[in-house]
């Protein structure tokens, strides 16, 4: 949510993340910058906030590609109906890129049908990973699993164990909940939990982050799997967000889903970045040397915010936490 109280919305402390973004652009002076946020900024009173943001970019010496666009990740092979506003800022005097054209679509089943059912493994009640061999056939899933090369991926190849299912800590449901999940038709919303049940040949609904601890630490509703009477795992959500299987998330479900829900789907981010590469005249080459994964300190995946700040030497209050309004 954005506050619009006061003379300038950008000056309101409740809008501090956007303020810090503009501050970093001013200080770092990149040639190009990209801003992504919810499409609600383009309608109603929030348009004022958007106008102020564009003015702030212009005052910092940047042109903004107009008209701005709301892009749907589903148009860029991400199996998720996720619409987000994108602003592209360009240092004045440099060429403006275009917004990316759609590249195609992927279905839910094409993304996650190969993943083993987490409920089969007792180990996943206490740990978020387990060793298991499984077959993957669809190109989208094969690329995310590292079994097939992606000609548009210029990142370092990763050397990791594709037969280890990670980020798959189980969620325990009551038998009553499982019966309700089973009885809910695919593509519909379960009436009690209000969880959306995935349709294998459709798209996932928007994966959201939920609220932080200052606002009650509520988990955003997680989709119900189309085949199994349970909500999706973090790994399944990651596939539905276009993250590769080598990418690890926080070991807890709450933090793992927040990391995914707060992020730009990699395939959508790549499409936007690709347009900037074109105007820069970049000719990318994929590195040959793989990065070896699997030998790091996995305890880092369990850190809370204060532990992570202490470990990396970052002040924990660099961006102040929101305080709850208890006077209600």
Locate the predicted segments by residue.
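C-terminal target-recognition/interaction regions appended to catalytic cores
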Residues: 139-328
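Class I S-adenosyl-L-methionine
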Residues: 3-188
């Amino acid at each position: 949510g954005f506050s619009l109280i006061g003379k300038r919305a950008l000056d309101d402390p409740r809008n501090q993340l956007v303020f810090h973004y503009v501050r970093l652009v001013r200080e770092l002076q990149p040639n190009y910058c990209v801003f992504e946020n919810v499409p609600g900024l383009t309608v109603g009173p929030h348009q004022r906030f958007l106008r102020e943001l564009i003015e702030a970019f212009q005052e910092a010496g940047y042109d903004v590609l107009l008209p701005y666009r709301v892009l749907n990740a589903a148009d860029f092979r991400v199996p998720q109906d996720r619409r987000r506003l994108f602003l592209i800022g360009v240092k004045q005097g440099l060429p403006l890129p275009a917004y990316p054209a759609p590249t195609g679509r992927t279905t839910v089943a094409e993304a996650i049908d190969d993943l083993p059912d987490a409920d089969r493994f007792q180990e996943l009640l206490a740990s978020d990973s387990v060793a298991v061999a499984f077959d993957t056939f669809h190109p989208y899933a094969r690329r995310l699993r590292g079994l097939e090369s992606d000609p548009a991926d210029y990142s370092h190849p990763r050397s990791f164990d594709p037969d280890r299912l990670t980020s798959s800590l189980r969620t325990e449901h009551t038998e009553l909940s499982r019966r309700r999940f089973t009885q809910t038709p695919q593509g519909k919303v379960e009436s009690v939990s209000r969880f959306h049940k995935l349709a294998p040949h459709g798209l996932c609904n928007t994966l959201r982050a939920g609220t932080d601890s200052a606002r009650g630490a509520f988990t955003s509703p997680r989709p119900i799997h189309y085949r199994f009477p349970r909500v999706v795992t973090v790994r399944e959500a990651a596939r539905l967000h276009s993250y590769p299987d080598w990418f690890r998330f926080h070991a807890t479900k709450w933090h793992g889903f927040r990391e995914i829900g707060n992020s730009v789907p990699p395939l959508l981010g790549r499409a936007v970045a690709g347009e900037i590469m074109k105007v820069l005249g970049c000719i990318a080459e994929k590195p040959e040397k793989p990065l070896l994964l699997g030998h790091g300190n996995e305890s880092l995946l369990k850190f809370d915010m204060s532990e992570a700040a202490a470990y990396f030497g970052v002040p924990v209050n660099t961006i102040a936490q929101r305080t709850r309004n208890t006077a209600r």
